Amino acid sequence: MSKGTGVEIPVYQPEKNITRAEFFAMVARWMDLDLTQYANVELPFVDAASIPDWALNEVKAMYSLGILKGGANESGLTVNALATISRAEAMTILGRTQAKGYAEPELTFSDAGQVPDWAAGYLRSLVGQGVITGNDNRIRPNDLLTRGEVAKLLYAML
């Protein structure tokens, strides 16, 4: 079991929206990666200096494995480590950790039309695996994700 990160005081705070750095760290640790293998990886992100030290090797690992790709803006490729993460972004990253070949059922949630094209395949795969079940026939792809929701997702993926 890994020690929690991202909160100055040792409190879980499940209702708090999770930052991208916290999410990357949780997923990398859930994957049980040997982070020492990635210490020398060069990151292409123009905002790499904003990645907290406690999450740097996790971000390097996730980038090296093709799980984290970043986003582009006028300055170049960014990781936005300190920003919060949307449910669609998180589900895309979680989907990239999975083997291929899972069923990809049609999304029948009432807000399925709000799922970005780049996230749809990953989301369908997670629905097919039973990881994503929705709530009140909604998946809220553009809402932010809380620390508690991430813990529940990672537990469902065990």
Segment roles from a protein language model:
Residues 2-24, 28-56, 68-88, 96-120, ...:
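Feature responds to low-complexity, polar/acidic, surface-exposed segments characteristic
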